[in-house]
């Protein structure tokens, strides 16, 4: 009991550090008491479940924490009277600009020094007819990617930009249907072609639709879009678009889509956006995809990997070529996993290293017991005291630069709601669990803090109520710059070496 009381007290201290009860310092109000009690309740629930919790030892909060500098880089305009719901930041080196999207529809370009922010395109503009569905926290303009030949005149990919967007327009016939659910809305992959890639604003015509998904439920609808940045012209991998397609939502994958090889849901797909051998003729299915002509019957040829729940982010290691994905778990396990062609990451037979039983239960027996599955390299428990009630893995980037030596050779990832950022070795990949995870804190000139604490301080300066969650994402810029985005204060931040921060 004494140890549990110590754990509770430490959790309160951590809550003050990470911003969960930032307003309570020196101000014993009803709001303060309520927040403290909420933290205590969360901790008590966590401690009560330690006998069945796969991660009974919490992530180290202080001793092993890595501290780096952080500064404000750029401000993105509000939309609908609220902070921009920033989702993704992408470097487009051909035009020497960063691009960041707001889930409500706008896509902004940001100069490399952060001083110029320009709306490049607005997917929600009536004349495009996209009808962006962004009424709920998970829906909207999900992701985007520039073709690697975007700024190369005379090539087939010149001027081409791809977006993945939820839409309320469900009239067109979908290419992929879930076979159940409530037909919540559709998610569409669109191709936009600008005439002048270096122009300040998009000057092309209406988008071309490549793929349309009928969504069974209102969450887990999108994912990430990216071209492999390590591929070169002439290589078979060059110009192939990877797309994270979540399991369609509700909870527990009730339609069993992630393990269904006839379904596009719960998968990482790989297509040739400039090809035409798909069923609808609007994109290509690469001949080297793992399930093409592999004797798997009616398995979809678009599938690159299966068994994912909500693959929000994936990236490649510039040194090893490894592809890693941050996949959001159900109610117990968050994970980061290696992805290879044909890999089965387990969902919904497995949640992380543990057999999935129900939305709130996994089995601790026979951990990592199926040799056919690809299990996480790291995973963490949603009940960890550092986190909020809801957790969601995000990231993920491999930092191979030396500008910030504390981060060199680390895989960086984070937890979306809490704003916690973590790292683990990219050279000595763990084999599951959370023991290898290091917490990362940020110093803006006033001591180490979490991203949520930084957001709350900014909210107060903006005259707003402090946010209770971060909704944080990471982005990678030129020369391996690491950017931090969120949906709560409109600020893009960039990591810097310690000592480069002005208080």
Where are these regions (language model features)?
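Bacterial N-terminal signal peptides
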Residues: 34-44
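Acidic/polar, solvent-exposed loop segments in beta-strand-rich repeat domains
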Residues: 250-263
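Blade-edge beta-strand/turn elements of extracellular beta-propeller
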Residues: 59-80, 115-135, 192-216, 267-307, ...
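Acidic, Gly/Ser/Thr-rich repeat motifs that build Ca2+-stabilized beta-propeller blades
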Residues: 49-252, 313-316, 321-329, 389-428, ...
